[in-house]
Amino acid sequence: MASLAPFFKISDSILADESFDDLEINNHFKCTSKDLNEYPRTSTPLPGEITSIYSLPRSYNNQNLCTRSKPTTFISQNQQKGMTEKPKHSEYFLRLMKTRQEMQKKLTAKNGSNKSVQQYLRKLPPSTSKEVTIIPVKMKPDDNSVYISKELSDRTDTKLPKVSTKEVEKFGEQSDDEERHERSHIASDFNQKTPQSTHATSNHRKRIFIGRTGAKQQHVSKKATESELPYNIDVSTSNTTNATEALKLLKRPLLLPSKDPRSSKMPRLDLNQHQFRCKQYIVHSQFTCTQIEKTFKCRVGTSTESEDLDDYYFDAMPDGKAPHFPQQPVARQNDDGSLELECFVDANPTPQVKWYYDNKEVENSGRFSANLANKGSDSYSAILTIKELADADAGAYRCAIVNPHGKGNANFNLKLTGFSSPTFVEKPQISSRDDGQVMVMEFRAKSILEPTFVWQKLVGGGAEEIIANSDRIKAVKKLEAGNVYYSALEIKEPTKDKDAGQFICTVKNESGKLTATFTVKFEVPEGAPSFTRKPQILQQTSAGGEPAICFDIGYSARMNPQVTWISPKSKKMKESSRIKFKTNDEGNGNFTAQLELTNYKAKDSGTYTCNIKNDAGEANVELTLNIEGPLDDYADDSEN
């Protein structure tokens, strides 16, 4: 304001003089008045607050009111209006004030405001302005390890309490212009003084290995679709590791700028950042670290002078290894239908493992069980087992592994897009009941989706579908507990001619099928009746000279076999004038059985059965007679 006083005193002459050209940015202007030569010419705006744009017109009018009796050249009304209306349209604003305000904004953004910074720093002792910035760390080529130079020194303070690493938070980076503006803003509110701390430093330097930082990520897609297992599973897996090399703060900083509401965290030493944040403060400048046994002392200040530095103590992390996934996670199904999610990890010390399903922790229960197994050295295997897998088990699973050196996550995305083909719970087998009168082919299969059962018999190299639920054959299907189905084929009075061979049952659902195969063999016990040749129907003449039909059967048997003939009406036949039975012993256990039918008529047509039985077993053979002609009445020769 003092430097602008001459300008206001002669403002009347400046505006009235015809030789007045313009005002320049750097306060240089052309005028014929000699008094103006006393106005200081500067290359930059002077410090201090810029006068209001209304000051010049107001001073000008007041001066004219006081000297109205003197001959004075007044400015016109339009000219006065141009200086007194809104600032952005006034001539004074456009010529001088607007230009100076633009310059002031640029300088404020670069160096801070004149009022807040320059005046405040005149009163503030230099030692009370403390700033900290972490030195960028250089990385070696093709190496994930981080190295930093540190000074060795002796620790002079006593044991200090530790602070948990959970209070650590990274703040980020700022450009140079943003840092200058941030320092100016913070310094405006800093109003406390703290004495400096003393320290001792050694000149010996040593290069110290800190550890591994950074993150690795792997993605793999795996699909398990085994036809013999009860599920088709689509599993997407990924690994993420984040190993943080941090130094835990032991002593709270003493000299720090105040009032930054963005964080209430304690400081953390992160080797890859230029700033760190600590409890309501942001600090950034330069620092040096000194190793004292297993503790690091950080010297912080605005200059390299030792008297301007403050000491902060950080506890070095113990030796060990952050969690690392050496291979891809695995998802597999067991024969019992359970699902296992397994991830492999290298860590030291032993990590803590937690499993999450849709971001909710999975607790050990009847269906879920978690296990961590040591595979030797620092290798571990974390397994989550899911029993009785159901539709509701699909979703996102996460294995969270953490130890003091870092943490890692293995992600599983389980999709049950469809269930696999049925599986055997009980293998196929053949049994009998009702004293061998019923043959049963049965098995049990498990299927989540309801299956269909189709029974077939191989005939002549092909497959013939069996008609179920007939008088002699019956198919059985029954649902039991746990999605288990029982299926059986029951055959009454099975015979070698009809029922020997291979039977197939196909179990099918929307995802696949299962085939059960049965082989039926009829084994004749020693001495049991068996047929030695193909039965024959012969046309001949009886002993009385009458036309006759003879059913001739050859068989072998021991232990006095008995022969029984069954008529087409399923009745036991007896001898009569028209029916004669003959049995001839041919030796070596071979026999011939004959049924002679004389005076045969059309009504004698039908299927006749010869049953041969002894203590070792029995055998049956059927013969079909077809006689053409009128159906005359004849006597019934069967037993009542």
Curated annotation (Swiss-Prot):
Protein name stated in the entry: Disorganized muscle protein 1
Cysteine pairings via disulfide bonds: 343-399
Entries under PANTHER family matching the protein: FI24025P1 (PTHR44170:SF54), PROTEIN SIDEKICK (PTHR44170)
Biased composition (Polar residues): 189-201
Gene source species: Caenorhabditis elegans
Compositional bias annotation for Basic and acidic residues: 154-186
GO cellular component: cytoplasm
Subcellular location: Cytoplasm
Record carries keyword Disulfide bond: yes
Domain of life: Eukaryota
UniProt record, GO biological process: cell adhesion
PROSITE patterns, per database record: IG_LIKE (PS50835)
Primary role: Stabilizes the attachment of the myofilament lattice to the muscle cell membrane. Isoform b is sufficient for wild-type function.
InterPro entries: Ig-like_dom, Ig-like_dom_sf, Ig-like_fold, Ig_I-set, Ig_sub, Ig_sub2
PTM annotation: The initiator methionine of isoform b is removed.
Lineage, opening ranks: Eukaryota, Metazoa, Ecdysozoa, Nematoda, Chromadorea
Tissue and organ expression note: Expressed throughout development from the 1.5 stage of embryogenesis in bodywall muscles.
Keywords for the protein's UniProt record, in alphabetical order: Cytoplasm, Disulfide bond, Immunoglobulin domain, Repeat
Main localization of the protein described in the UniProt heading: cytoplasm
Residue ranges constituting the Ig-like C2-type domain according to the UniProt record: 323-417, 422-521, 529-626
UniProt cross-references to Pfam families, sorted A to Z: I-set
Residue segments, region Disordered: 154-204
